[in-house]
Amino acid sequence: ASIIISSYDTSTGNSLSNKVSNSGKFETDDTGRLVSKAVDKCMEEFIATMNMKFADIQKNGRSVLVDFSFSENSSYNMTSQVGNDKLALSDVLEEWFSTNSFNNNYHIQGTTNLKMIFDDVKIPVKDKNQNNYTTNKFALEIFKYLKTLGLEPSKEIKGSTIYLTIN
């Protein structure tokens, strides 16, 4: 019997560990026994990989992607001046991510007039009160910040991706 074992981070949907194994050839009609042998062959390595990923997430944070765009009727774009300093929205967003990503760890995939994608933003596993910190909580923080800039955002979350549309 051949098996594939996979584990995923429930908060983001990101893969933690994947292993493929087979039982080898045995003379038996007992499928359960064959599956058990296949699992036994890979379980130690599977758990070690998963534990290594958990330790990395604890140390370096969880990865999320944040995609900013504009609704068709929006009067804003990434060069619109916002905030007290009247900086371009793209610059204001980068400053916010610099301060609010875990250990200042983020990467910008690209910025155009109508889109900005942070393709790897690290967020903590726990908040300052040691409560679970989820993708949804991070999205809410961004949403509230955009509101303080006088913007009217909408948000959607799919797995580890946050979509923010500025209306």
What are these regions (language model features)?
Residues I3-I4, R62-V64, S160:
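Envelope-exposed proteins and targeting segments
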Residues I5, V66-F68, V121, L164:
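Generic structural hydrophobic/aromatic packing signal, biased to beta-strands
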Residues S6-T12, S69-N73, K126:
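Solvent-exposed coil/turn segments that connect beta secondary-structure elements
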Residues N14-W96, S101-N104:
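C-terminal/domain-edge helix-coil "capping" segments
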